Amino acid sequence: MFILILILNIRNENLSTFNSIVTHDLMLSAAKTLAKLNPDMTFIYVSGSGTDSTESGRTMWARVKGRTENELLRLPFKAAYMFRPGLIIPANGVKSKTKSYQLMYDVMKPFNPLLKRFGSVITSEQLGRAMVRVGKDGYSHSIVESSDLKKIGKY
């Protein structure tokens, strides 16, 4: 079993060309190569909550991620899953190397127990477990929303 995990989180509207190149073009290029090398693999793409599969919404990043998901699902993999986590809270004291993210995590830390009750909030540990489980065992839907990821990623 081979699982490829790529997380691209670019949401700045002013970087729409870069966003499209990195989120769509680079991802599709890598995925097409992998599909040729091993069509029997399971491919998991982490996009994010709010991704627009219709490709017609108002938000550029959501349309690009939706287009990327749609094209990935058409590739000849054994299985492909599009993970759409919302807020990901780092688990086990993991620190972000991005200072602005770490500042946000530090400010939000007192609220984490409350935030974890919402379906769109997931820990990095739950997300990792969900990736391994879906990669190994599959899942009934190709689009996996944050609330489902949370259930799959439970101990």
Predicted regions and their residues:
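NAD(P)H-binding glycine-rich loop region in Rossmannoid oxidoreductase-like domains
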Residues: 1-35, 52, 135
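Beta-hairpin (beta-strand-turn-beta-strand) motif
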Residues: 6-7, 48-49, 88
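Internal, well-ordered alpha-helical scaffold/interface segments
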Residues: 28-32, 41-44, 62, 66, ...
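Non-catalytic positions within long, well-ordered alpha-helices that form the structural scaffold/packing
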Residues: 35-36, 73
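A short helix->loop->beta-strand "cap" motif at the edges of active sites that frequently abuts
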Residues: 38-41, 77-78
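Short, flexible segments with low predicted structural confidence
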Residues: 42-45, 98-100
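SDR active-site strand-loop-helix element
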Residues: 43-49, 83-85
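Oxidoreductase cofactor-interface core, primarily capturing Rossmann-like NAD(P)-dependent enzymes
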Residues: 53-153
